[in-house]
Amino acid sequence: MISCNILGITIAAFITSTLAAYSSNGVNVMYYWGQNSAGGSNTQGSLVSYCQSGQVDVIILSFLNKFNMGGLPEINLASACEQTFFPNTNLLHCPTVGSDIKTCQSNGVKVLLSLGGAAGSYGFSSDSEGQTFAETIWNLFGGGTSDTRPFDDAVIDGIDLDIEGGSSTGYAAFVTALRSKGHFLIGAAPQCPFPDAILGSVIDAVGLDFVNVQFYNNVCSVASGSSFNFDVWNDWAKNKSPNKNIKVMLTVPGSSTAAGSGYASIAELGPIVSSVISQYSSFGGVSVWDASQAWNNNGFHSELYSIVHGSSAALGQAARKTPFPNTSSITTTSLATASSALFPLLYAGRSCSSQSKVSCTSTGSYTICNYGKWVTAPCPPGVICLSSAQSNNTDLTVSAQFFITSFAGGSFKAIINARRTTLTPFEKMKTIEFTVPDHVRLSQCNLGKIEQVGRSVRIRLKDHPNMAFVLNLSGNVSSDAFVAPDPSSWRFS
């Protein structure tokens, strides 16, 4: 009896391990790996340990975070590869990772390299720089040759553009040039508000294989109810993307500590995956930030793999080809009370000209300009529409978004999602200044100190130099309505 049980477990484990393999036509489960965002000394396993788990189809090495145009780029894999630089360079030599890449590929798991990330310094000043960098990437990581290949003779399967900051200049030229070198999987990781502030024009210009849409740290997160906007991305994939067969990945946090907001437990995520896969033929699976978080989250990784592949198998290809319905749950960009005198009802179907513009209706719903027509949708349960609760500020150097994640009993929680729009990253010490209404009082933030005198707020942050950051705030409102900070008052220094 004991022998039978052991044999059964062994066979089950073998079957599971053989199931994990990348599918070009079906769904996949992708994990970002390398940064050990869980933060513990033993929270991140080796690359090969994930590839042999039977619960990963694609691994994304994170990150190549410094382009260093005119020289060699830099990679950062946290504790997975440290202080082993090629002589007289800042480029890591990681032979163990290289060996693991080849083992992963022999098991059918694709290995990609992510360019960018929140921390680093990257971007192009021209298309020619993008084309030159494509040659660099091909020689260092692809099928080219170089004396300074970080992973030796291992050849990655593609790249992921996780461009959190900078400008869009040069990326379309980079992708086009890299495509000309040979077969590479190429994707991008835009944030879910549509269109993405930096990658929007890039993904409209060149055909990609997938987009890892970040459905977290934004109002359109997977956990936001009717604000979740996968339908908008499906619409883009089918009607505007140069590659009409592009896969839209549902990118989520691997645990509650993996992101500032937007985490959905596996119990919550299961029905969402089943719903998305049944409605949208562009659905390509689930991507997770990151492996260290998911593997330390009470079986999240194993249940997720079963959910994604189980939903796909149960549904079958015929059901997956069902046309997606008319948009009814478009992303909202704000949460605040509405006055019909100030925010008149914008009737669904009427013409509009400002893509993605959002306003509240007099009934407490919200309406968004979607491809020339106003579309109205209800707010999530327990939430009312606040037309001024998000402020968007774009100056010459920063694009910032302020939105409310909860508002009840006079208390609120909010997020500032800031992205650099130049090639120079934010410095280690940062200051944010803005003006709030008289009845709003900020009390806490996760990265620094809040100083408020009357309506004037100053937040001093101490963080790593980075291209983007997410700041969690909380405070109180002595009013029944929340009004956002004045967009014209935002200052970043």
Curated annotation (Swiss-Prot):
The organism's taxonomic lineage, starting at the top: Eukaryota, Fungi, Fungi incertae sedis, Mucoromycota, Mucoromycotina
Any one GO molecular-function label of the UniProt entry: chitin binding
Cellular component terms per the entry's GO annotation: extracellular region
Keyword Hydrolase part of the UniProt annotation: yes
Keywords: Carbohydrate metabolism, Chitin degradation, Glycosidase, Hydrolase, Polysaccharide degradation, Signal
Catalyses which reaction(s): Random endo-hydrolysis of N-acetyl-beta-D-glucosaminide (1->4)-beta-linkages in chitin and chitodextrins
Protein name: Chitinase 1
Pfam families: CBM_19 (PF03427), Glyco_hydro_18 (PF00704)
Enzyme Commission no: 3.2.1.14
Highest taxon in the source lineage: Eukaryota
Gene Ontology BP, a term: polysaccharide catabolic process
Domain GH18: start-end pairs: 27-318
Family label: Belongs to the glycosyl hydrolase 18 family. Chitinase class III subfamily.
Signal sequence residues: 1-20
Organism the protein comes from: Rhizopus niveus
Annotated catalytic residues: 164 (proton donor)
